[in-house]
């Protein structure tokens, strides 16, 4: 009986850490901004976009530009 309480307690601690973390469950199924940029035909660049292209979004969590 004591062991089952201990297991239940550790399970609750683990689940509470996951919930307060990086929103593990809401992050499932979301694509990275780099993936979305390349999938739409763009390219991720840290420098300015080349001539005849424009900024369509960001890549690498806002550190680079998605040029298309």
Curated annotation (Swiss-Prot):
Disulfide bonds join 37-66, 44-59, 49-67. One of its GO terms (cellular component) is membrane. It is found in: Secreted; Membrane. One of its GO terms (biological process) is antimicrobial humoral immune response mediated by antimicrobial peptide. Residues 1-21 form the signal peptide. Residues 22-32 form a propeptide. InterPro entries: Defensin_beta-like (IPR001855). The keyword Endoplasmic reticulum does not apply. GO terms for molecular function: CCR6 chemokine receptor binding; identical protein binding. Has bactericidal activity. May act as a ligand for C-C chemokine receptor CCR6. Positively regulates the sperm motility and bactericidal activity in a CCR6-dependent manner. Binds to CCR6 and triggers Ca2+ mobilization in the sperm which is important for its motility. Monomer. Homodimer. Belongs to the beta-defensin family. This is Beta-defensin 1. The gene is DEFB1.
